[in-house]
Each structure stands twice: as C-alpha cells, then as structure tokens.
C-alpha cells in the first residue's frame, strides 16, 4: 500500500450555508460531518495518517470527540490551512479533501491512487456538456475540465509550492506553479459538495440524534458597598455591589457553565479567563451571547434552562420575570425559568456576605432537515 496521508479541510466559516451551525458540525446520527467524512474515507483507503484542519477554537473540542486523528490550525486562506497541515505530513503522498465533499466513492479514490506514481498531482474532473463561451468567443468544450476534490499530490512538492506568495485555487494549480506534472482522472457526478442548506437534500444522511445533553453550573460572588447588583441581566437597586472581574452576574455565570457543561466544553474560566483585561467589567449578557453563538456553531440548540438564585438580600422575586425575558431572547428559547431562594440566614448568604446561583441547561442537536 502506498504511503498516503489524508488531510481533511474543515476550517471554513460556512458563510453561504446560512444556518446557525457550521456545515462541518451537522450531526449524522451522533457524529459531526467532519468525523463522518474522515471515517468514511479511512474505510475506503488505508491512510498512514489522518489530519483534520479546523478553526483553532474548535480543535480542543474535536480532540475530545476523536482522539485518533491529528489536528492542524486553519488559516486565512485554504492554502494557508493546507500549509499548516503539511507541516505534520511525513508520507510521500498527501490526499487532500474537503469536509463539504461528503460522499466520495471508493472507485474515485482508487482511480486517483492508481495514477499518483505517474504524476505529481492527480485531480478528478468532470467534462463540460454545454456550449461554452469566453466573452463572445466560443470555446471547444472538449478542452475544458471542471476540477473536483479530492486531489492527491507528492507532499514535498506541494509543500514547496505553498511556500511561495502566490494565490492558488487548488492543489493542482500549486503543483503546476512548482513545475510539477499534472494528471487527471474521471470524476464523479455524485461527489457533490455541500455549499447551501438545500444541498443536504441530495444526501441520504441519518438525521441528527435526539439525544438530550444536560449540564449544571454554580457561581458565587461576594458583596461590597454599592448601589445595585446585576443578576440574570437585570440591575437590582440595593445597598450592595458584587465583586468580580466582569459585572459579577452570578446567575448568568452559572448558566454559562451549565451550557458549556452540557456540550463538554469546559467552563467559563477557560473561555473568559480573569487574567484577560478585555473582560474587565464586561456585561455578562455579552459573554452569554458569545457562549450561545459558539454552541450553535457546533450544532447544539438550547432546549431549556433553569436557574436558582440564592440570596438573603435583596429580594429577587420582583425581577424574575424580567430575567426570564432577557435570557429567553439570548438563548432563543422560551423555556427559561428563574427561581429565588434564601438559606434561612445560614452561611455566607444568610450573613448577607454575597449571593450564589445554581443553573441547569438541556441541549440537543439542531435538526438540519429543517433548514
């Protein structure tokens, strides 16, 4: 078997996909598309290594899902992403594909591999069947090729090509620039690319699992002298303030940890460390929106949230409805509940030294069939 590394590109922003989630994070049953594609390709070819190129913020989460792959940070352009992956490639050949090209046949893979010894880069192509013009001049359609992915190249030559400052549209253009020999094989009409949500109708994917994920969070902040405290996004007039790096909204902090916990994304200290001055005094609603946006991109929707605020003073009940209204808008669900409790004058809460909050959240996968 030839020495070939699979590089799967999954760092795109899915701008044209027009959904709350990135296409690489749609769930095929329980697994995200990038993992589904990588495993499907690995069953059709015995790759010496598999490297996933992804957004830097998503890599740590990907590693929790799939520990048998290697990961490389995505770049500004496709070729920057590929160059980052090539630093980890030790094989003679590299097989580069896109997560969006979700169903590659074993026959197409075989055609590419069978030709790779003869050329420096081999690409699949589709012929043009329609009459074609360039401006006002008709072109012989037999001279035209519509290039698809995946492509297989000699790794060292592709690395060399990408060291230049030229902009390349694909691997074949880069290898040609470096003086390499190009080969072409018959492509596959069925090797569709997912660009828009409507493209998903062409794939016979298993729908996203209906699994529910539950997380919980807890937070405490101490009182200082002041004029108001902020809880659940609502300013509550009182003789106190809350001490913290941000606005010390314990209710929202507990809620964020509950959401992150449900997804297995760590805690808010990892996302928004108190050593980062950009978060000094920040409105916690802004941080919550960032958390919601992030879990949405990863394919999760928030089903419901339940928060208990524990405070001897001030009275929380008059503000619960407004808290629910604010949080429902951010979470994009009406299923938000806020409760108030005391400790019957026991402990630091009973001594009016601070407040605590407990939160639970249930999340599920977006049903991509509805988009």
From Swiss-Prot:
Residues 1-212 are annotated as: 2-C-methyl-D-erythritol 4-phosphate cytidylyltransferase. GO terms for molecular function: 2-C-methyl-D-erythritol 2,4-cyclodiphosphate synthase activity; 2-C-methyl-D-erythritol 4-phosphate cytidylyltransferase activity; metal ion binding. Pfam families: IspD, YgbB. It catalyses: 2-C-methyl-D-erythritol 4-phosphate + CTP + H(+) = 4-CDP-2-C-methyl-D-erythritol + diphosphate; 4-CDP-2-C-methyl-D-erythritol 2-phosphate = 2-C-methyl-D-erythritol 2,4-cyclic diphosphate + CMP. PROSITE patterns: ISPF (PS01350). Pathway: Isoprenoid biosynthesis; isopentenyl diphosphate biosynthesis via DXP pathway; isopentenyl diphosphate from 1-deoxy-D-xylulose 5-phosphate: step 2/6; Isoprenoid biosynthesis; isopentenyl diphosphate biosynthesis via DXP pathway; isopentenyl diphosphate from 1-deoxy-D-xylulose 5-phosphate: step 4/6. A divalent metal cation binds at residues 219, 221, 253. Its EC number is 2.7.7.60, 4.6.1.12. Residues 213-371 are annotated as: 2-C-methyl-D-erythritol 2,4-cyclodiphosphate synthase. The record marks 141, 193 as: Positions MEP for the nucleophilic attack. It comes from the Bacteria. Keywords: Isoprene biosynthesis, Lyase, Metal-binding, Multifunctional enzyme, Nucleotidyltransferase, Transferase. Disulfide bonds: none annotated. 4-CDP-2-C-methyl-D-erythritol 2-phosphate binds at residues 219-221, 245-246, 267-269, 272-276, 341-344, 348, 351. Transmembrane segments: none annotated. GO terms for biological process: isopentenyl diphosphate biosynthetic process, methylerythritol 4-phosphate pathway; terpenoid biosynthetic process. The record marks 16, 23, 245, 342 as: Transition state stabilizer. Its cofactor is a divalent metal cation. NCBIfam families: ispF, PRK09382.1. PANTHER family: 2-C-METHYL-D-ERYTHRITOL 2,4-CYCLODIPHOSPHATE SYNTHASE, CHLOROPLASTIC. In the N-terminal section; belongs to the IspD/TarI cytidylyltransferase family. IspD subfamily. In the C-terminal section; belongs to the IspF family. Bifunctional enzyme that catalyzes the formation of 4-diphosphocytidyl-2-C-methyl-D-erythritol from CTP and 2-C-methyl-D-erythritol 4-phosphate (MEP) (IspD), and catalyzes the conversion of 4-diphosphocytidyl-2-C-methyl-D-erythritol 2-phosphate (CDP-ME2P) to 2-C-methyl-D-erythritol 2,4-cyclodiphosphate (ME-CPP) with a corresponding release of cytidine 5-monophosphate (CMP) (IspF). This is Bifunctional enzyme IspD/IspF.
